[in-house]
Amino acid sequence: MALALALALISCSTDEGPLTFRQSWKTASRYASSHRDAWQQVWQRYDVPSDVAEAVIFPELVRYNFWQDMAEVSAVESGYIPGGTEGCDYSIGRFQMKPSFIEDLEKRWMRSDLAEPYGLSYDTSDTQTARQARFDRLSSEEGQAVYLAVYLRMLFLDYGSLDRDGNIVQEGLDTLPPVEQVRLAATAYNHGTLWRSPGTGSLDRIRAVTAEEKFPLPNLFRTRMRYYSYGDLAARYYAQVFNK
């Protein structure tokens, strides 16, 4: 009953979305469908549920603007590589990832026990060489797909049920129905994440901002912006595509 009510609320709260940005939604859906197999190959390497991962970044696909992204990629290349995040910190790529977001994520990953088992390590030093390598990864869609996998692994670890010793300490993200995992993971992705340690992240903190409508999308004629709940859009997409 609770899940049915949640899905009904998602539908009611975002029905206007596909009507006002119908073409962008359809274009994003086609793009996701055509890239799904390639994304799945990446996400499965890191034991990340590919349906959840795709839904988490779907709203960014709806908003994506090629020409704006090209300009921002150029700005990040010329500003971030030599000067760090103070030089430039634009979100880039289809998944709209900021260098500062990725720097924090890499550091959290390298503090975890997952880097060695998955054979994935990062140079987190404050050097131009490390920033160049990071930019190269961010400029690649496969690189961004790997970062999303890393993000979700860390999110499910820090906001999961188990502490570092494997003791159950809370009802974590892993215990929720998939559509709710999507809603909360997407909200955290959009709002920013406070990295903790295993089992210590507060889902209530994420829930507190889930309903906030701060994600801007243009209307059909791109004459003005309307603001949406990022988590609700992601959950709606999941319900449409994967939870039929």
Regions found by a protein language model. Name each.
Residues 2-8:
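Bacterial N-terminal signal peptides
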Residues 7, 51, 92, 143, ...:
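Generic structural microfeature
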Residues 12-15, 37, 44, 104-244:
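Non-catalytic cell-wall polysaccharide-engagement segments
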Residues 13-90, 142, 146, 159-176:
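Export/targeting segments at the very N-terminus of extracytoplasmic proteins
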Residues 55, 93-96, 188:
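Structural recognition of the beta-strand scaffold that forms the well-ordered cores
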Residues 60-64, 101, 189-193:
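Alpha-helical transition-metal enzyme core signature, strongest for iron centers
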Residues 87-96, 100-104:
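Electropositive, surface-exposed helix/loop patches at the edges of structured domains
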